[in-house]
Curated annotation (Swiss-Prot):
It comes from the Bacteria. One of its GO terms (biological process) is tetrahydrofolate biosynthetic process. InterPro entries: GTP_cyclohydrolase_FolE2 (IPR022838), GTP_cyclohydrolase_FolE2/MptA (IPR003801). Keywords: Hydrolase. The keyword Cell inner membrane does not apply. The gene is folE2. This is GTP cyclohydrolase FolE2. It comes from Neisseria meningitidis serogroup B (strain ATCC BAA-335 / MC58). It catalyses: GTP + H2O = 7,8-dihydroneopterin 3'-triphosphate + formate + H(+). Pathway: Cofactor biosynthesis; 7,8-dihydroneopterin triphosphate biosynthesis; 7,8-dihydroneopterin triphosphate from GTP: step 1/1. Coiled coil: none annotated. The record marks C188 as: May be catalytically important. The keyword Repressor does not apply.
Length: 298
């Protein structure tokens, strides 16, 4: 590969009429020159994606998956920074060979606003327009952290939750959904009933997926679930706290069936929520398998 000398660059600039002469090249002139040359180069490169496809098969979703990207979240408890994994896809008509993959990343690079449902709608709308499509979907998955206070000592610590926000444009309409996984403690009612002392308990993952007519906060979904668990989880506990959570779980036993039914009852009472799925997986401490339950509403 032959390297271009500074004198050669000056010569090209002089020939193109961008920089008339001299020994120093101002950055603005050089940037203008490079932008012009880049556009000229792009015009000479074949755009294969935009060529015609003859197989007559549309693609429901095509795009990028698992793009890791730093985001900020606008939540009820303030702005939070986190790292997201994004899947961004659009509908591709039968006659078009391919989509423009670089445009998905370019769109994310342009957005610095904190993410909430309003911003997700804006992002999805812009993506569909940018890709010249009639339908598109963006899923944003990220760890969400919440500061929790230990029940006795009052010590504060963070606990993480897995969240996925999805925005979709389909058939000319926009819709969004939210999925939150909340870790909790469950204690077996049967074990408590038949044992002279103690009962087996374990960590459980309760996952809520919902759609709503009005915005429902991530924190609200977490509160609904934690209120129905045998006990909440905490990032940091002292001995008095550990005693408290152990005894609270013992006094509030829940089967996996109880968990999904009680959470579902709370969600049904919230008139903003129009549909949901509740799942609970109990990582049984006395078995090498999990207990599982699922409710879909309506």
């Amino acid at each position: 590969m032959q390297l271009l000398k500074a004198s050669d660059i000056i010569s090209h600039l002089q020939i193109d009429g961008i920089f008339p002469g001299g020994n120093a090249i101002p950055c603005t002139h050089l940037n203008n020159y490079m932008n012009i040359k880049e556009k000229q180069l792009m015009n000479t490169i074949a755009d294969v994606q935009s060529s015609r496809d003859l197989r007559n098969l549309p693609i429901n979703q095509v795009g990028i998956k698992d793009l890791r990207f730093p985001i900020t979240l606008q939540t009820a408890e303030g702005i939070q920074s986190t790292i997201a994994r994004l899947t961004m896809t659009v509908y591709l008509p039968a006659e078009q060979k391919g989509t423009h993959m670089s445009r998905f990343v370019a769109l994310m690079e342009q957005h610095a606003e904190a993410l909430d449902f309003a911003q997700l709608r804006k992002l999805t709308t812009e993506m569909v327009a940018l890709l010249d499509s009639r339908a598109g979907k963006i899923s944003v998955s990220f760890p969400f952290f919440r500061k929790k206070t230990a029940p006795v000592s009052g010590i504060r610590s963070l606990l993480d939750y897995d969240v996925c926000l999805t925005g979709e444009i389909k058939d000319g309409a926009y819709g969004h959904s939210m999925k939150v996984m909340i870790p909790v403690t469950s204690l077996c009612p049967c074990s408590k009933e038949i044992s002279q002392y103690g009962a087996h308990n374990q960590r459980s993952h309760v996952t809520v997926s919902l759609t709503a007519d009005a915005e429902v906060g991530i924190e609200e979904v977490i509160d609904y679930v934690e209120a129905q668990a045998s006990c909440q989880l905490y990032g940091l506990l002292k001995r008095p706290d550990e005693k408290y959570v152990t005894e609270k779980a013992y006094e509030n036993p829940k089967f996996v069936e109880d968990m999904v039914r009680d959470v579902a009852t709370s969600l049904i009472a919230d008139k903003r929520i129009k549909s949901f799925v509740v799942e609970s997986e109990n990582f049984e401490s006395i078995h090498n398998h999990s207990a599982y339950a699922y409710i879909a509403y309506p």
